UniProtKB/Swiss-Prot annotation, chains A, B, C:
Superkingdom of the source species: Bacteria
Keywords: Isomerase
E.C. designation(s): 5.3.1.12
Protein name (Swiss-Prot/TrEMBL): Uronate isomerase
Species of the source: Caulobacter vibrioides (strain ATCC 19089 / CIP 103742 / CB 15)
Residue pairs linked by disulfide bridges in the UniProt entry: none
Pathway: Carbohydrate metabolism; pentose and glucuronate interconversion
InterPro entries xrefs: Metal_Hydrolase, Uronate_isomerase
One annotated GO biological process: D-galacturonate catabolic process
Length: 487, 487, 487
């Protein structure tokens, strides 16, 4: 007999009764607000085709590196979890994979995955017992059965989750066919894209040659020549904007920027295109391209997102056997003050530009990022990110950033996820942690309750809409209520 | 109708009733103790001339980079706030500037400025409504009217604020005329100076040539020759000591120290004086001068303060248009263990020397500073500084420093401010946060209440007096009570 | 009349009543569990000879650098505390030294030493008044008298402290005679060793030449030839395993690892042995030897412990007068992601290897260590260490590590101490802080109480036994209950 899954309505609120009471009141103001998800990695084909998801392992376990990295760290093989390797998807029985997961679920105690998964299990699927070995089959069967119903198809879940806007991420070398299909389908869900050009900027990425080929096709430009390479970016940015994009997204190893002359930049590009790639030149080119992207933003208005500091695919053995993105990305020490100076010297006071900074190095919150964002008009701070998208991580972000940057140089929450079913859970955690933080401010008389009430709504809804320029829906997008009424 | 300004008597105390009760009791022991302000940047001419302050904008807004940097970060122009540029003070109507400030006051939610300003508004000026757009004019008028009265002249406020000692900061190239005037005025307020020689030590500072010229005048020495350059320092240090100084103050980019031979040091100086300035040589000279200053302290007893780690005037556009110190100083990663070793190897065990270290890089609290101060007899730790002079920042300082360095290797609070009216507010915050920290220690049975009671008085009053050698007033300085009786 | 020493049963528990109640309940489950001490620095001769300890100063003060570093930082001379210098033990009256300590005991307020010492005073010696100048003699006399009794001999205390396993640390060049004596004595206390080869790996350590000589003797190998140097390690590791060792221990300046070819490694070793020592070559050799040790672990199963980041003996004057290990070790910024990559690329996925990482740089908890341990099967995280072995330090460890690495990639508590009497105090603090952390999780509904109950037992007892492979006692070791029955 498994333990009852009591997913408490006061979860994540401080235990002190006065503070908890304020937290409850603040959370009540925002718990039913629509979800703004301006930065994430869901698959647009889900919403284009609206095909049902397959089974519990295929949807929840095998693609989620948060989950399989933890199990891998404890000696569980990725094959046993049905995680795709370079040889393809292992032929592990998905039910067996789910059993392995269930019997190791205790590993997630104290992690945000515990909160997210139990939210999904209880709120999305209606389970009332904690997952464990004894009920693994019941979980697997009931989830798989639910997924076969219309109520669990992607669009139905999108509506049920009360998502107002959902951004995916694509590269300039990728087609936007699924976004076109969504737009033309008449469904009306506001699914947009974001412009992530890393693969055609990073000459050290082994995927770069193929991405350049496809970039030439999608843009119709000679992308091996500097001026038309830039023109290709301009054209694709516009195509992304036509597909709803309001932001670009840049995941570089460091925050380095540069401000080369046109002649220098062209010479650097030519050298790299010819295959003369050194780490220094690749880094300088990435740095220069952040400034080039910023210059394009002056004209087309895309908000820039910069999130540096991950050592990608650190586990060489796993990269060789399983390829990229298998939970082996490790944060590195990151520097912003010198790194951003060339770009900021060029454009830091330009009212047409908006840059959202992220970090995996929490030491920069109070030392670098809050002082920068609390001064430069072009800078804002993205929420605590990736490993730090967690109750303690979010609280540290607020505690270390707010006193210098205030709340209004931050941009609300990003779920940044490809785990579609966890989106409501992640936003719920953010709303609860922000409520808890503000509740403490009120309980300690550092803020008036009226101010906290305004702030919780701003942090949840108004700031992300404003920061990501999502204030207006395009004609083809309609609120879920209208979609529901139309059905 | 604006919201009532309820500035609660329990502000900044933890909400848990037991802890709050201890905090109240501890705070009650120190809330009326005199203010010791051993490190700050108020203008000594205020106390020398005792001329009235001008208006709300001129006193509270335009000179305060904490305030205008936040508004600037949100797109408000400095001209609209009447902040001086290189072209002079903008002719903005001060009332209009105040209105802009009032309508953006919500930006300061969650920041220490919110606490400080509401303290000033309610406790110094008696306002009972929160500042907002609707009452901006009322605020402006009442503040400006109050400032015209004798009760709001600098000396009257000094007495009302119960300041026992206030240190300003001057350079060796600057006159101490205002301090002389204060001393000779018969007023009796204990306003002293501190010796800050950065401008005649940092050959990379563009103000350095003019400072050297004036240093030659104030010292009567050939400051372009190494031996008389050092003699000029010795003479000016003594003049500062005669004007009450008990400390020197060193704001270098890094904490680097050096221990060159006399021959090496002289050669380095000669090279720099001849204009052969490279970043490496300028850095080495700053490093060597910290050791030279320490050697002079052995003889004259000045306490050294070292606070490295700020990238000054990071915003190049703003530096060009508005000059230095416009809220664009950004902290950098800072290293102490290797940097201080030359000086500590030379003098680290000398009982005649006392060095107070500050940081803008909070990661050094537990890793470097507390271990250093918990071992070396010459080292003590200054309070959380600048961006970290805030409730969360102060609490992090105590939490991260105390377990290794204890309380008695710290030196109490520094307000470090040029915002004279905020001095009581800042000291009040420090007293409250220390009370809250000690209250938690007591509530968690990690300290006896008797010990906490001794400590709160030590942290507030005894430690700063001892660390800054302020145990004795000079003959010309008299307590406020005597000054009041004399009037 | 000194204050009563009220060492409260709720110490270190949060004040919030609901949280405290959970903390009490969790702590009750583990407070009487046996102590597993898999990493420490007690002297095995104590347990081999079972000779009585001498007096309060000799046992508690003079050898404890946590204590005398704090007093030294406040100007107390080491001679006054009877701390051994290069000239020998000062002839200070031990009672006088104890009086100096007592009159400065207030310096330890807020530090873990305060908690540990008051635990020892009240729980081990039965004092009921806080130590202060007025009762210094009473403390000295009563402690010294107690130490002369059989109940305070090392083995009796070992039993009374309910220690199940205690590991000491020896070098490969050192004899294991005391461990042999313990094993053969019939006493049955499970005192084991750990393999710490730093002195024969670090060519920059001035003790290295003498250590190599002794290494040749203990191993019977030509340790100046690469292949037999490695063989000497293999032989000594096996001898340590025979003396109960389950782990090796590596205290390097950095976490650097290398993976040289055999030819490169041999050439490097030959060059160093010939005396051609540069910092770069010494560092590379240390780096390579971590990989060599890991390779040997594949065969012999020793768990590797790596704890980098201390600048040893920073105070040059004190090193000259008093020698090493006098409280002047200062942590440095430490990097793991690049540093460990060579070793992890070679062996990071090998199920035969287990590495426990420690740090003195808390910034690496959430940025580097938790992400590494939350992915690599060979990595686990040691507890907060040295300066961070403290209530706040332990809490930061849990708060910053758990969300990414979970609990099961950590290994429970290490006391890491040579202060034998403080071992129960230190483990008690860890149990209380873990109880407090878990209590908050439960009170905030982030974990089920049943899970927290399982976890507190795992963190206290099961994880260290498993991580250090202490699941089985050897034949010669018997539980304290059996030893007691036998007497």
């Amino acid at each position: 007999m498994a333990r009852p899954l009591s997913f408490h309505e006061d979860r994540l609120f401080p235990s002190d009764p006065a503070t908890r009471s304020y937290a409850r009141g603040l959370y009540a103001l925002v718990k039913d607000l629509p979800i703004i998800s301006p930065h994430g990695h869901t698959d647009p084909s889900w919403f284009a085709t609206n095909a049902p998801f397959q089974d519990a392992t295929d949807l929840l376990l095998a693609p989620d590196h948060y989950l399989f990295r933890m199990l891998y760290s404890q000696g569980v093989s990725l094959d046993a979890l049905k995680v795709r390797s370079k040889a393809g998807v292992p032929d592990t029985d998905p039910r067996e994979a789910w059993r392995v997961f269930a019997s190791h679920f205790y590993l997630f105690r104290g992690t945000p995955s515990w909160v997210w998964l139990n939210h999904v299990f209880s709120q999305v699927f209606g389970f009332t017992e904690f997952l464990e070995a004894s009920n693994a089959d019941d979980y697997f069967d009931r989830i798989t059965a639910a997924l076969a119903t219309d109520a669990f198809r992607p669009r139905a879940l999108f509506d049920r989750f009360n998502i107002e806007t959902l951004a995916t991420t694509e590269g300039p070398h990728e087609s936007l066919q699924h976004h076109a299909a969504i737009r033309e389908s008449g469904w009306g869900g506001h699914v947009i894209t974001a412009y992530r050009p890393d693969a055609v900027i990073d000459f050290e990425d082994e995927r770069s040659p193929r991405a350049f080929e496809r970039f030439a096709e999608t843009s119709g430009q000679d992308v091996y020549s500097w001026k038309s390479y830039l023109e290709a970016h301009r054209l694709r940015r516009q195509a992304f904007i036509d597909a709803g994009a309001t932001s670009s997204d840049h995941g570089h190893p460091t925050a380095a920027t540069a401000d080369l002359s046109d002649v220098e930049a062209e010479a650097l590009f030519n050298s790299l295109v010819k295959g003369d790639v050194t780490p220094e030149k690749a880094e300088l080119f990435r740095a220069q391209m952040l400034t080039e992207m910023a210059k394009m933003s002056l004209d087309d208005g895309l908000v820039m997102q910069i999130h540096p500091g991950s050592h990608r695919n650190h586990n060489v053995g796993l990269l060789n056997s399983h390829g990229r993105d298998k939970g082996a990305d490790i944060p590195m020490r990151t520097e912003y003050v010198d790194a951003l100076k060339p770009l900021l010297t060029r454009l830091g006071n330009d009212p047409r530009l908006s840059i959202i900074l992220f970090t995996l190095d929490e030491t920069t919150y109070s030392r670098e990022l809050a002082p920068l964002a609390g001064h430069y008009p072009v800078l804002k701070l993205g929420p605590s990110w990736w490993f730090h998208d967690s109750p303690e991580g979010m609280m540290r972000f607020r505690e270390q950033v707010t006193e210098t940057a205030g709340f209004y140089n931050t941009v609300g929450f990003n779920d940044d996820t490809r785990a579609f079913l966890s989106i409501p859970a992640r936003h719920d955690v953010a709303r609860r942690v922000d409520s808890a933080f503000l509740a403490r401010m009120v309980a300690e008389h550092r803020m008036d309750l009226v101010e906290a009430e305004e702030l919780i709504v701003d942090l949840t809804y108004n700031l992300p809409k404003k920061a990501y320029k999502l204030d207006q829906r395009p004609d083809w997008a309609r609120p879920a209520t209208l979609r529901a009424a139309a059905e």
